[in-house]
């Protein structure tokens, strides 16, 4: 396990910073973490122990904005693209840029009008000559809510789910690779509207993203097939196969955070003294009510950590090995 706590980026008191300064710090920390672990394409695709070790780094509960960037970037964007590298090796330079966080990957699936029913998304990619026209047909089809602004000096690229339309026929939903912004500005036809900050969380530049007749080359389609699936729902689940793993990753910093809380609570309970019946102060850890709370947190953190690591081993064993890489 790496010791990132000694790095100056994690020694800053972010509570004294402005919202935008905190967001910028989260991006800088995410880049530091990813470069420190130096993950390969195979690590991401095959869920190696090194891949899960990054998610379980005890530094991540200190900045959930940083973890949010990493979780979506690696699990959803890089993981989705990596599946198609054997058929589209021209994407390898992009994936290497993503793994170095020189470029941030964004996963645009759900829409303002389609969250849990994302199978029914409305964004379209209409076949046009040697490419596609990506378009948001109405406000409810705006992609919600990954961070897509150029405000923090990092280029962003997205995997965008859209319905393929060929000669007026709906061929089902597929992922397209779409440049979102440079380090300074949005690409033509792409609009990002930043959402208000959510209270009680690490801030990020969460946004609503829409497309106005954006031309995409044929190579933007991940997988390349224009055929309509025989089973549209099964095909859709196959497209979004990384989501269950991404959902599992979200629990990692929460369990590390529980262990942090248990340690802090135990140390405080040993240090804090009060007078009870006699003149000599005693630590509040001597009270059964305090012992129960601390020991419960220690037990829960330990058991969940063992359980989570066993699930990690299952994902590694069940993944497809990549002998070509």
Q: Where on the chain are the PLM-derived regions?
A:
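Amphipathic, small/basic residue-rich leader segments at the start of a protein or domain
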Residues: 1-104, 115-116, 127-133, 316-321
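Short Pro/Gly-enriched beta-strand edge/turn motifs at strand-loop
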Residues: 102-109, 190-193
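Sensory/regulatory domains in signal-transduction proteins
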Residues: 109-117, 140-142
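Short, solvent-exposed loop/turn segments at the edges of secondary structure
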Residues: 118-120, 153-155, 170-171, 204-206
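Short beta-alpha junctions and helix-cap segments that line functional grooves
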Residues: 121, 144-148, 195-197
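Hydrophobic/aromatic beta-strand elements that line small-molecule binding cavities or substrate pockets
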Residues: 122-126
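Internal glycine-rich alpha/beta core junctions
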Residues: 127-136, 171, 178-325
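A short core secondary-structure module
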Residues: 133-191
